[in-house]
Amino acid sequence: MTKLVAIVGATGLQGSSVLKSLHATGKYKLRALSRNPDGNQAASLKAKYSGVEWVPANLDDTASLRKAFQGANTVFGVTQFFQKDIMERVEHGDVDAEYNQGKNIVDAAIAAGVDSIVLSSIDSMKQLSHGKYPGVLHFEGKHKVEEYLTSLSDKVKGYFVYLGFYMENFVDFSRISPEDNKTIEFTVPLKPTTKLPLVDTANDTGPVVAYVLEHPEECLGTVVEVSGGYYEAQDMAKAFTEVTGKPSRYVQIPYDSIGSDELGQMFKGQDEFGYYGGRTEFIERNKEIKHTFTTPTSFWKNRG
């Protein structure tokens, strides 16, 4: 019998990548969840991927999630810290805002009789830094959901994918140099030689989730990192110039210059303790995934 996969956040970067990859396999029935399944983003995806069922769901409404998960064998779950309603709740003291949405996904999936959940999670920076940087809320919330799901392993199978450092961030970090009005500066609060497991979210997430679903026994209860390997932060600037021919440079800026203690702690932790805590085992294992992971060079080439 063809298995049904319900995809949370199907119009987002991660969810749409999962939708694309699973649809390409032709092996699954797909149900796409969105707060607005009749919106423009959903319409664009509907035009690309036929045969997908679209349903409304709100991560704050467990009843809507239970309904959306009915009959599904697997749920792909993802939460988003950097959205207006979550940020506002955090500003008003609700530091568990993202965790609560993730918990709702888990609880609703169990109530609907779902067999397994593939959860987009990440390491706890508090744990990686041995308590030095406890305030990276968009890491802590996701990891807390992972711990909650793990504690319920007798009720639902848990699989975990950890995305690397978003290459898309470097687009946001870029500016035209005020010195010559020509050079592209990548202003980042990281040491230029800090090694990052880079990922193109839209291109690399889906193939990894597809791999997890194809290898359920091997991946059960484990972490599968979503990246092809480590690169120095400054490599993104070097690759930009190589691909475009435009002058660029990497500029390390102070941690406190970004106006966010939460992000400042994240960058400090990555400089000191490494993204993924410096783990490298995934590089060899990910060669088994039939996917060419994005590199700094291919990222800029793909952006035209």
Features from the language model and the residues they span:
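A hydrophobic C-terminal alpha-helical subdomain
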Residues: C219, T244, P254-G304
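Double-stranded beta-helix
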Residues: Y250-V251
